[in-house]
Design a protein with these regions (language model features):
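Short, flexible/disordered intra-domain loops and linkers
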Residues: 2-10, 188-193
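Right-hand nucleic-acid polymerase module
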Residues: 4-121
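Acidic, divalent-metal-binding catalytic cores of TOPRIM
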Residues: 111-205
Length: 205
């Protein structure tokens, strides 16, 4: 943090090397850089300064992948067709970094105050849950409704073979999915954990 250390660089490196070797390690000079705390430091896709940020190129690539997915139904990662889970992993990684920064700044962060990236993530989540899902999604009003519906379907599975099938091992295979209300969906899509306004909020998109 002391920018005057550059005037004593040789002494500093000697002391640093001595401490590292004392701990049983060896300093690799080819992979060692000295930076000020506000210098741009790139580590595995992260720009590590006083405030952590995602490398701009990583963000742009993720946004481009999502755009191609929405337009064509597919996208590539390293010249191979990517999966929805892979793309969600990239969005989730960026979001984790931004959530950390949101905690330390003084701005308001909620559904009505999404930044540019969060709006991109919002669009992806809507695409995943309400467009690209491979099963019809049932949206319930209360969080316990899912348990009651599942229990009823199991009891009457022979009457609703398009919704549920009992397998040979006795387990049930649901042909429908249930939307689980999470903090993430509440933040990005305004889908609260309880409430009757869920369908109204979904239809806004």
């Amino acid at each position: 943090n002391d920018k005057k250390f550059i005037d004593q660089i040789d002494y500093f490196l000697h002391k640093l090397t001595k401490e590292i070797e004392k701990a049983g390690f060896k300093l690799n000079k080819n992979k060692t850089n000295l930076n000020f705390k506000d210098s741009r430091q790139l580590v595995t896709g992260l720009v590590v300064n006083k405030k952590i940020n995602v490398d701009r190129r990583y963000y742009k690539e993720t946004r481009a992948m999502a755009h191609r997915l929405y337009k064509t139904g597919e996208f590539q990662i390293d010249d191979k067709n990517g999966t929805l889970n892979q793309l969600e992993g990239r969005f989730s990684f960026i979001n984790q970094v931004q959530r950390y920064n949101n905690v330390i700044d003084s701005s308001k962060h909620d559904f009505n105050n999404l930044n540019a990236f969060e709006k991109q993530y919002q669009a992806f989540l809507f695409y995943k849950y309400f467009y690209a899902n491979n099963k019809p999604h049932i949206v319930t009003e209360g969080k316990t409704d899912i348990n009651y519906i599942k229990a009823a379907l199991k009891k009457h599975h022979l009457e609703f073979p398009n919704l549920i099938v009992k397998k040979e091992d006795g387990e049930f295979d649901f042909r429908v999915a249930f939307l689980k209300r999470t903090n993430r969906l509440a933040y990005f899509l305004n889908i609260k954990k309880d409430g009757a306004d869920t369908m109204k909020n979904i239809c806004k998109y």
